[in-house]
Every structure is written in structure tokens, then in C-alpha cells.
Amino acid sequence: MKEKTMPDFVHLHCHTQYSLLDGASDIEKMMLKAAESEMKGVALTDHGNMFGAFKFVAEAEKHNLKPMVGCEFYLVEDRHKRVFSNARGEKDNRYHQLLLAKNKQGYENLSKLCSLGFIEGLYGKFPRIDKELLLQYHEGIIATSCCIGAEIPQAIIHGDLEKAENLIKWWVDLLGDDFYIEIQRHAGLENIDGLGISQEDVNQHLIRFAKKYNLRVIATNDSHYINEEDAAPHDILLCVNTGGKITDENRFRFSSNEYFFKTKEEMAARFSDIPEALDNTLHVFDKIDTLKLKRDILLPKFPIPPGFDSPTTYLRHLVYEGALHRYGELTAQVTERLDFELKIISDMGFEGYFL
């Protein structure tokens, strides 16, 4: 009898320490574990920002992994709205939305969305985008139905299957087969928000929609820390974030200790009944170009006045002129410190910046 082959898998939903006060995964350790698990690549999807992108890509290269740069955005109806009426029951309804860059254009569009989230959509500590921006900056981007905090799963959780289906159609119209149905399986989500629906119930609805619209299903783990034993320190991080006490029974916490960076074997066991959802992560992987984010540092070219042969000599002249004005006679200690600082600036090629 032929031995059954274990499905392949790459993580497409990962939070690092750059998901501020929410993620606890060190990028270097995450890359090491991905390599040890013989994964071909890994995604970066921090909350609302791409602060870790350069470090992420550099570390992936060290371990011969493909870096898949993305972001889990905060999606709202109107990014400009900052006033909400309690009397009318209004609140800032933020949904999670996972996006990945397929190529250089996609990376540039993700960067634009991130920037506009802060510039135009910042409310409290949340950089927010809306569908108006997505209509403008969606080229080169892959999207998923995301986690239970996303708009489509939330519609399902609250019993509005028609809304969920219409949202799926909106994404398909926008992205075609670059939109994927994402399913997750975390313990402790058997009765979400006390509404009598479980994460698995949500998954089954999503799978039915995927079949109806011929969409690929991908399996993910909402990774926020590296290993299972990191759940406890991560819980402390959440307390710092929310101001809650570790002893408070009613504070915000994750549903279980399963939000870690699982190995391929652990994911295969969790999704043994739908192995194609694991293999489909490679379908996403194959679509994504390997990003090269290294580039020369762009610094101003400062015009050098006559009598100086380089920015180095002119900066040195100005520094010593200023030091004499400030200190009068220069001691050996001051001279040594000035030369030390000037050497660092020169070695880095930052003379034009300081001038």
C-alpha cells in the first residue's frame, strides 16, 4: 500500500513583535523555526503596519525562505469618520483584513494603504483603511476572508449569511482568483460572543461559499508567538496592552494557547480532513514574487563651498568652528570625542545628511 504523502504548507497569517503589544514572535526565531520545519516561505501580516518588512525580508534571505510581505489591516466603512454618537448606538466598527503583496506593485500598494491608514484613517491607536482606498490600490494584491475578527466571518457569526455572500462577491469582483477563503481552528471558540456559533460553524459556511464561487480554501493559524509555552508571556503582553490584570477573569484574552507558529506536522494533524486547504497555501506561495527591498540610502547632496574638497572636510570645518565657539580652547577630551563622532558619520556616508 502506497504511503500517504503529507500535504505541504506555509504560514500565511503571522504576527511578530511589530504587531505592537499584540504579537510576540521574534522575526529571527520565526524564520529559524520555519526553516527547521522545512517550509519554503513564511508571511508577515502584522496589525495595521509593515514596520518589520525590511528585517523580515533580510532574515528570510539568510534562511533561504521566500518572504511574503503583507499586513492585517483595520477595515472600516469610512476612514475619515472620527466622531461616533453613543445616543445613536454608533461605534468604530473595525474589521481585520489580511492582504499580501504578489509583486513589487502590490508591495507599493500595501505601503500606500499603510501610510494612508495612519495619515487619513488614524483613530485612537488604530490606522484604518476603507474600501474606497482598496478600489484605488488593489493591483498586485492577494486578499483572504481572514479571521473571525474580519467582516465576512463577523456577518456569519451574527447570522447574516446574505451579507457574508455579498461581501465575498465584492472581493471576487475586485480580485478574482486572488481572493481566498481562509479557515482557522483554535480551541476555545465553541460559542463566539455567546451567540451559539463556533469557529468550525463559521468554517463550514465559508467552505460552502468557496464551493459555490469556485474559490480556493487556505488553512492558517493565527500565529502570535513562536512556541506553545510562549502563550503565558504573551498573555502578560495583552494585559500591558489593555491595562487588565492577569487575575481578572473578565479581561481580554486569547481563546487558548494554540496561537503559536505551528510546524507542518501540527497543521497537517489539525486539518487532516481538508488537506487541500494546506496545499493551497502553496498556490498562494507560487503566485508571490520574491521581494528585494535592499536599496542604496537616499541622502541629500549638499553643495560644498570653494576651498573644501569634500563633504567630510567641510563638515569637519563646521564642527570644529562650532566647538571653538562653544568651548573656547578645545581639550584633548573634546577633540577625541569630536573625531570619534565625525568618523562614525563619515564611515556611514552621512555627511550630506548632517550638513
Regions found by a protein language model. Name each.
Residues 1-355:
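Phosphodiester-processing cores and adjacent nucleic acid-binding clamps
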